[in-house]
């Protein structure tokens, strides 16, 4: 019996780029990537599209916590401080709209499993 559906898991660039101090986070996002690939392969025959989406750096409370972390605990903190200074984030609204388009807009359908959202400013 053929059905149609979509599964969207939220990944992160941390799935591909290791960050000191983020071992568990990086590993869990890499696991999300692999799990989504397996689900896409296993469930394609019933019409399920599965995607893992790395939404970019989003202006959230998590980012505020990251920027408040000391450099000795998180050596890459300056990167995130610089992003804030330049206001170079994706907004939660931009990400939500992109995810809704992926799920419901037929023109946005893709067979790609791992997706990265572009920067909102581009």
Predicted regions and their residues:
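Active-site helix of classical SDR
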Residues: 28
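Residue(s) in the substrate-gating loop at a strand-loop-helix junction
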Residues: 12
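A short hydrophobic alpha-helix cap/turn motif
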Residues: 1, 43-45, 58
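Active-site-adjacent segment of SDR/Rossmann-fold oxidoreductases
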Residues: 17, 38-48
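C-terminal helical subdomain
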Residues: 48, 52-55, 60, 71-122
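Active-site loop immediately N-terminal to the catalytic Tyr-X3-Lys motif
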Residues: 17-23
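Catalytic tyrosine of NAD(P)H-dependent dehydrogenase/reductases that use a Tyr as the general acid/base
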Residues: 25, 33
